[in-house]
Amino acid sequence: MAHEIVDGSSMQRALTRITYEIIEQNKGVDNLVFVGIKTRGVYLAQRLAKRMEQLEGVKVPVGSLDITLYRDDRHQPDHHVEPTVNATDVDVDINDKHVILVDDVLYTGRTVRAALDALMDLGRPKRISLAVLVDRGHRELPIRPDFVGKNIPTSNSETVHVAVEEYDGHEDISLENRK
């Protein structure tokens, strides 16, 4: 059974902090594009863009990225079943832009690796940064986030669930032991 470790208001504060860090490190918002990794990363990217518009008065474009076909584990456990592919929606030219890739949880790094491959098929950004709401450790690839909402050390037998209002109908971060 999952138990809440971060409530909705703490999630909002973490996203606001990430927004300020992005503005500070980027020295403004020029040439920024948020690209959320489906599913919850898209909603988080939209929130970051909305908060940035409130703070800076500039509307930052937001896209969504489906990485299904780029995953290195897509044929496991049954390699005969084809994956369900959702649409990638990046309506802005990412060439020579600073792309902020957004995801809910960073774990092994494999999702981010797949997202980088998918992103490079769309263009050649000047720079790519990674923003995650939760970094839980246990990397299998040399990937490190640039912006982190919460560092939550976990064991490999635990699962981190991020719930967002837009998709789940409630908002929190919970931890569950896998059996």
UniProtKB/Swiss-Prot annotation:
CDD domains: PRTases_typeI. It catalyses: UMP + diphosphate = 5-phospho-alpha-D-ribose 1-diphosphate + uracil. GO terms for molecular function: RNA binding; uracil phosphoribosyltransferase activity. InterPro entries: PRibTrfase_dom, PRTase-like, PyrR, PyrR_bifunctional. A motif (PRPP-binding) lies at residues 99-111. Pfam families: Pribosyltran. The keyword Transcription applies. The keyword Membrane does not apply. It comes from the Bacteria. One of its GO terms (biological process) is DNA-templated transcription termination. Its EC number is 2.4.2.9. Keywords: Glycosyltransferase, RNA-binding, Transcription, Transcription regulation, Transcription termination, Transferase. HAMAP family: PyrR. Belongs to the purine/pyrimidine phosphoribosyltransferase family. PyrR subfamily. Regulates transcriptional attenuation of the pyrimidine nucleotide (pyr) operon by binding in a uridine-dependent manner to specific sites on pyr mRNA. This disrupts an antiterminator hairpin in the RNA and favors formation of a downstream transcription terminator, leading to a reduced expression of downstream genes. Homodimer and homohexamer; in equilibrium. This is Bifunctional protein PyrR.
